[in-house]
Amino acid sequence: HLVKELGAEVTVFRNDQFQLRELDRFDKIILSPGPGIPSEAGLLMDLIKTYAGRKPMLGVCLGHQAIGEAFGAKLTNLSEVYHGVATPCTQFGNDPIFAGMSKRIEIGRYHSWVVDRTNFPECLDVTAVSDDGCIMGLKHKHYDIHGIQFHPESVLTPEGKTIIKNWLAFDGEDFDKSWA
């Protein structure tokens, strides 16, 4: 587990087997991957709405999609499923989780849904896109909330450990700073 390997204490909860108040004691929250769509993922949507602006969050895959939906985005079911597929993507340099990385990165994709670019919420910024135009990264403009559609823990994402390290180190200071 990358987070533990980087020195952080980790507690894992199933998305339907915890009370929201249990999360008060944690410094940061990772919204992990999983099957299905956010509305079918237990307390995931309630968690985001409860802790937005109160706790830093990183959404991975399903967690990324949930962040999008929680703030008003829609999801699109892809005609082509990506499960264990390595593709390049472009990160725009506007999110500190990508600090120190080149604009073009390789990512491991395991999904069939994406956050739709149509009517994208004003409160979110797109931070990375795949070559086929799918949103691969997003962040909230005012809260310390970041999402990545791809899997940083995958061997297909060579710089995934850097992304997690950057997120763990980011303290929300200079949040609106350009990270290009």
Predicted regions span which residues?
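Pocket-forming structural segment of enzyme catalytic cores
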Residues: 47-52, 57-58, 68-145, 150, ...
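N-terminal beta1-alpha1 cap of cysteine-dependent amidohydrolase-like domains
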Residues: 1-55, 62, 158-180
